[in-house]
Amino acid sequence: MDLRVIDKSDTELSIEIAGEDHTFMNVIKGALLETEGVTAATYDVNPEQSGGQTDPVLTIKTEEGVDALEALEDGTDAVIEKADNFTDAFEAAA
């Protein structure tokens, strides 16, 4: 997975995530929408200027005083925690 920051301000971040598809992008978007201080999280695989399918571009917008990059870190930590909890539950059930 390769990441490329496209645009960054204190309350907004657009980042290209190479090699990922809707499955991963929906998971990270969902976690971000549950993250405190995040006002919007979306992704696009067909930006208007691209002329077709591209690597997904994730865009995060946050409340004033909430750094968008830190919100992304919080969202990814939440995904990791959910995956770990699922693994533990699966192993306990097996």
Swiss-Prot record:
Protein name: DNA-directed RNA polymerase subunit Rpo11
GO biological process, one term: DNA-templated transcription
An annotated Gene Ontology molecular function: protein dimerization activity
GO CC, alphabetical: cytoplasm; DNA-directed RNA polymerase complex
Catalytic activity: RNA(n) + a ribonucleoside 5'-triphosphate = RNA(n+1) + diphosphate
Record keywords, A-Z: Cytoplasm, DNA-directed RNA polymerase, Nucleotidyltransferase, Transcription, Transferase
Subunit and partners: Part of the RNA polymerase complex.
Enzyme class: transferase
Database matches in InterPro entries: RBP11-like, RBP11-like_dimer, RNA_pol_Rpb11_13-16kDa_CS, Rpo11-like
Signal peptide, first to last residue: none
NCBIfam families found in the cross-reference section: PRK01146.1-5 (NF002236)
Main function: DNA-dependent RNA polymerase (RNAP) catalyzes the transcription of DNA into RNA using the four ribonucleoside triphosphates as substrates.
Presence of keyword Transcription: yes
EC code: 2.7.7.6
Subcellular location as annotated: Cytoplasm
Family: Belongs to the archaeal Rpo11/eukaryotic RPB11/RPC19 RNA polymerase subunit family.
